[in-house]
């Protein structure tokens, strides 16, 4: 909220023209004051299904000439992972440099973790595959500061990022939750260098090996017109970055805020920003999933959504499976797509990276997906159906586990 009131005060004093500006211009100005890096002249392609992501990514990997860098929370050892690594093996034999980082915690608690014999065979074929912060007993020492990235950079020309790990449930769903929905994107342009820097930093943290940035950063030109800001959460360095930028965007919204997030247990600062937006008359629409991949998180999310509903927010429950997307649209003017959930783990502990995209066409595409899902798969939460959707057992669970939601 302090960012909103600072802008308001400057307007009242006549020292700023923010009052005549739309929210995207105000947010860009505040981001620049805060030092968040901007990249202009990009092209963005949204990839709203697992099939679209993997078809596009695999084609790009097959055409790689120089290097392939991948940094993922987890690679699930299943059919889609085998298909990807088979392509990467072929590229490594052609002389393409292949470097892969995966998170130890994400792998260990995967349904189908990468096993040592398989990893050894992959490494023997010429790929560098490294495990970030190996989990050892006692595991509790490694629960914080996990690598939650989902990034691929190919030849310094193309980057992929968003909510999808590498697993076939993005194509086939899961028995307990049904279809697994998510949002990824493909980026051309200067922003690719930002993702390459994120990879190089994680590579160093994992291997203590410094990569020569001049070797991997692109100086090429892109004819795109999309302006993007990179927001990276690095523990002990930029720990407040994701929640700060979310709050700046929400605090300066003028008309409508639309959010899809799978684990919206919410930290206090974001919840307060949303409540103040509602008081200003801003329309707030949030899409939450009826099911989830954890036993109690949906109950805690339900408590938060109930509170916001009572404050005037429109809460839509997605019944078409599990919506794992991490996106927000503001005023139809700008949006964010990234890896961060709206929970304490993403906002206070893990390594995360989000892109804020200042492009009305990209934002409109996300809004179209949002409205389509509302029409086809969602039910509006009301005081009447709240008790039906959340019977006493779930309400008690939500209240009890809300007290420790910072650890969920």
Where do the model's predicted regions map?
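Sec-dependent N-terminal signal peptides
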Residues: 4-13
């Amino acid at each position: 909220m302090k960012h909103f009131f600072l802008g308001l005060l400057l307007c009242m004093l006549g020292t700023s023209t923010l009052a005549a500006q739309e929210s995207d211009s105000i947010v860009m100005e505040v981001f620049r004051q805060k030092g968040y890096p901007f990249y202009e002249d990009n092209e963005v392609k949204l990839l709203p299904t697992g099939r679209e992501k993997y078809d596009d990514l695999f084609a790009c990997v097959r055409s790689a000439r120089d290097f392939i860098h991948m940094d993922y929370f987890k690679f699930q050892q299943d059919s889609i992972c085998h298909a990807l690594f088979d392509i990467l093996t072929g590229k490594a034999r052609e002389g393409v440099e292949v470097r892969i980082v995966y998170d130890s915690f994400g792998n260990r608690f995967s349904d189908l973790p990468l096993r040592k014999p398989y990893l050894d065979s992959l490494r023997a074929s010429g790929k560098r595959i490294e495990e970030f912060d190996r989990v050892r007993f006692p595991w509790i020492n490694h629960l914080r500061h996990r690598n939650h990235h989902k990034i691929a950079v190919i030849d310094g020309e193309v980057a992929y990022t968003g909510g999808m790990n590498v697993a076939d449930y993005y194509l086939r769903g899961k028995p307990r939750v049904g279809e697994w929905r998510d949002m990824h994107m493909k980026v051309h342009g200067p922003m690719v260098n930002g993702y390459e820097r994120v990879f190089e930093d994680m590579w160093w943290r994992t291997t203590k090996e410094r990569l020569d940035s001049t070797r991997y950063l692109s100086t090429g030109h892109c004819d795109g017109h999309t302006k993007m800001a990179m927001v990276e959460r690095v523990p002990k360095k930029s720990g407040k970055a994701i929640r700060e930028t979310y709050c700046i965007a929400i605090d300066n919204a003028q008309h409508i805020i639309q959010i899809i997030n799978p684990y919206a247990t919410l930290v206090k600062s974001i919840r307060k920003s949303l409540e103040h937006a509602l008081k200003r008359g801003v329309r707030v629409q949030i899409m939450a999933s009826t099911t989830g991949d954890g036993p109690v998180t949906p109950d805690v999310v339900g408590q938060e959504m109930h509170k916001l509903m009572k404050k005037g927010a429109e809460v839509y429950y997605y019944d078409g499976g599990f919506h794992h997307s991490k996106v927000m649209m503001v005023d139809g003017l700008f949006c964010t797509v990234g890896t961060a959930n709206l929970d304490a783990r993403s906002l206070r502990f893990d390594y995360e990276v989000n892109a804020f995209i200042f492009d009305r066409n990209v934002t409109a595409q996300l809004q179209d997906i949002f409205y389509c899902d509302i029409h086809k798969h969602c039910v509006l939460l009301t005081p009447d159906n709240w008790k039906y959707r959340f019977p006493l057992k779930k309400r008690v669970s939500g209240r009890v586990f809300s007290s420790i939601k910072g650890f969920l």
